[in-house]
Structure formats: C-alpha cells, structure tokens
Swiss-Prot record:
Protein name listed in UniProt: Polypeptide N-acetylgalactosaminyltransferase 13
Binding-site residues, Mn(2+): 208, 210, 343
Domain notes: There are two conserved domains in the glycosyltransferase region: the N-terminal domain (domain A, also called GT1 motif), which is probably involved in manganese coordination and substrate binding and the C-terminal domain (domain B, also called Gal/GalNAc-T motif), which is probably involved in catalytic reaction and UDP-Gal binding. The ricin B-type lectin domain binds to GalNAc and contributes to the glycopeptide specificity.
InterPro entries on file: GalNAc-T, Glyco_trans_2-like, Nucleotide-diphossugar_trans, Ricin_B-like_lectins, Ricin_B_lectin
Organism per entry: Homo sapiens
Transmembrane segment boundaries: 5-27
Amino acid sequence: MRRFVYCKVVLATSLMWVLVDVFLLLYFSECNKCDDKKERSLLPALRAVISRNQEGPGEMGKAVLIPKDDQEKMKELFKINQFNLMASDLIALNRSLPDVRLEGCKTKVYPDELPNTSVVIVFHNEAWSTLLRTVYSVINRSPHYLLSEVILVDDASERDFLKLTLENYVKNLEVPVKIIRMEERSGLIRARLRGAAASKGQVITFLDAHCECTLGWLEPLLARIKEDRKTVVCPIIDVISDDTFEYMAGSDMTYGGFNWKLNFRWYPVPQREMDRRKGDRTLPVRTPTMAGGLFSIDRNYFEEIGTYDAGMDIWGGENLEMSFRIWQCGGSLEIVTCSHVGHVFRKATPYTFPGGTGHVINKNNRRLAEVWMDEFKDFFYIISPGVVKVDYGDVSVRKTLRENLKCKPFSWYLENIYPDSQIPRRYYSLGEIRNVETNQCLDNMGRKENEKVGIFNCHGMGGNQVFSYTADKEIRTDDLCLDVSRLNGPVIMLKCHHMRGNQLWEYDAERLTLRHVNSNQCLDEPSEEDKMVPTMQDCSGSRSQQWLLRNMTLGT
C-alpha cells in the first residue's frame, strides 16, 4: 500500500512539472504578441533548459575525455581542425555552461533601450559542431530584441556540409541567419568587411567560428556602446580547451598589449588602471590593444573610423592596426569584464596562407607600421628586418584617413595609453651585442623568464639577437632584462623592474666592457662547461670581456 501511495506521489509530481514546462513554453510563446521585451527574451533560454540533457558530455563546460580505444582515431580527426573534433562532436550544440561572471556583474541592471546588433561570424572549413555551437550560443543567450541577425560569411569553404546542408539547417532557427559566400579565399579581414557591409544592426559584433557565448554576455557590451558610441568593447575571452573542450573562465585582471615583434600579448592590468576604477573589477578595463577575434563596435563608427585596412591579407596585425587607430583617432578600447565569451584556442592553425604565414604577417605589420607608428617604425624594423623586404602595397589612402581624422602621434599613444609598453622610449643602442673574442652574439634563444641568456653565432636577422641598452642602463630583450643576483652569475632574464639593482649595467664605450654594477663583475665569454651561455668574471679588460653594441649612436 505504501509503495502504491509513493508511486502516485512520484507520478503526480512528474506530471505537475511537465504541465508547468508546457505552460511556461506556451506562455512565453504568446509573449511574442506582448510588449515586454525582457519576457520575450527569456524564451530561447527556457527552451534550451527544457530540452537539454544536463548529464551529457561537456555539460556545464566539463571536459570530455576520449577512451583509450579511440585515441588513435581522435588524433587523426584532430588534424582536420587542430582541435579535438571527436570531443566536440560528442557535445550538444546547445550545451550548458557555468556562470563565470563576477558576483557584482550578476546583479547589474542595464537600460531597456539598448542598440541592437548584427553578429558577424566568418568561417573557412569550420567543423559543423563548433560552428553551430557558436550560433546556438548566440541565439540562446541573447535577448532576441537585441539580436538583429546572425551573418555567417563563408570564406570559400570546400566541405559539402557547409553548403546546402548548412543553408537548410539555419532556415529553421529562431533568429534570422544569413549566409554570405565569398567567391574565392579572401581571408578574415575582407570576409568581415563583406559581412559588415551586409549588416543591418546598429552595432556590429564580430565573433570567431569556434566560440560559446555565456549568460548575460551581450547586454554589457551594448550598454557600454550606448554610453559612448566611440567605445569599442571586447568581452573577457574565456578558454575552451582544444583537447577536451573544457570551459575555463578567463581572467579579468589581464589586458592587451604587444611585444617588440608586434605580437599581441596578455599582460597584468596595471595598478594605475585599478586605481582609475577605484578597485571596482566590474567596471570596464581600458586596454591598449585587443585580441581582435571578438568585439562589438557601433556600425556607423566602424565606417567613420575606417573599418579594416582592406590592403591587409588573410589575418594578422589587423587587431593592432585597429587598436592603434581607435586610440590615436579619438576613440577608446575596453574589455567589459561583465561579458564572457569562450574561444577554442588552438596551438596551430589548420589553414595555409597564400605566400606563406610569414610573408602575410610581415606585409600586414609593415602597413600598420608605415601608417601609425611614426618614427617608432624604425625600432620595429631593427627587431624584424625581414619586414622591410616585403611589398606592402599602397598605403596612401590609409595615411589620408589618418590626416582627415586628425589622429594623434604614436608617441602620444605610448605615453598616455600604453606607458607600460615594452618599447623603450630612450636607449643608447638597439641591435646585436657581439663578443670581440668569439665573434658571437647574445641570444635570448626564445627562452622565457627566469632562464639563462644564451650566446650564439651572429645571424644578422634581428629577432632573438636584438637587445637594447636603455637610458636606464638596462640590457633588455623585449620585456625581459639581464639580471645577475650573485657573484659569478649566472646571467638570467627577468621581468624588467626599473629599480636598477641587479639589472643595472655600465657600458664603457672605450674599453667596450659591460660591467654589472652590483657585483662589480664584467660580462664574459662562455666557459668550457657550457659554451652556450655567457659568464660573469672579475673585470680584466681582456678581449673576451669586450662587446660591440650595434647602433650605438641610435636614440642617444
């Protein structure tokens, strides 16, 4: 009898929840006829919750681990897109994700009247599951009254499932999804320009084709643009593992910068920016540069500021070019810490670049240097001499744009927007540091912080053999300085702290010696024990302690 009563209770409870679900679904469907935008915006999220199996692979952003028996097949599939395709295909297209926002972000209230947005996603031979998961995350986690359309720009994909199959599939989605086909492989930059030209939203939001938007991602971006239409905003970019598709929250304590080679890099948010925000981490972070894959911009302002440089090829450098242009021409660039979007970070690209990756990036970087970096372009050319050899085309239109917009000089950008830049404003020399005795050069060997500086045959190609002897008497290689903490070394590379101490060196232009002030020893040739690293020895004036600093008059 008790079992019978228990069964009736369970059945009644289950039936009640089914009826509640049906009622809510019908109720919110009817809200299409009402005026309350916020209620209507809940419909896609509600449907997703009702239909989802919360225990499936990858739910709540959990890692998907492939059994040992399938490892070989997994590795083969990995090569197609340079991420774990097998894991991705096991995960639901509308999988659940954790709410990774700061607690203060969860209670923020945004204005009712926000600008709407077109979401532009460029893809080339993208995997079905990652592309559709990107689209579903946009639709399911965006209020539909703010979502004008999703524009998919196909950059000449060759895979059949990305043609008619995709077109038929997106017809049934709840938000208008438009597919634009590029006639030939054109690259991210020109494909985005095509998508932007076709957009109708007041704001354009660019996303990569392997992203996942989280709860509340869109409103903070649009609210900031509503406050200032000349503000270009980026979400915090969370990490989706290319191996397991685990969703990992990104840090709100990093912002965008660049190194000597004009490679985008993440750096800790400086104290001055924390002070400006009065310690409130839910406020946007002013960032010198953006990663470039994910951002929102007022559509009219995008046109006014000069869209993208259409003379650049494929991708690479366009993010820094746009970052410099926005700041130098009166706009601002921010990371909105209450917005989170995940991105699959790959260790390698599965695509080829016409002419080779190096050629494309060198051309793009040369264009941005010629237009935006003023005299600092010469610093970059010493670091990367190969850039000077490429044909970078005509930049007269971009220079005219800069003149018409009355943009500020690059020195202003470094002093006011990016004072933490790794580019030394004053230096005595820039280039190789060559040992007179061995005719070898100091070389950072591509090593990281807290590793020994090396010495190697001089190659004259810049890169790892470019060091700057700064006006602060540091020996710098990018953001690392040569540091000696005890007698007889070793000489290691540490973050430059600008406090002199272990990083203070005196160069004697007559004796050609580099004396470490704290230890009162001189930089010397390698020992027999390790011929790949320089040593520290008592100063003797020998040829092995003599060093020639390239371009010694430059920057004095």
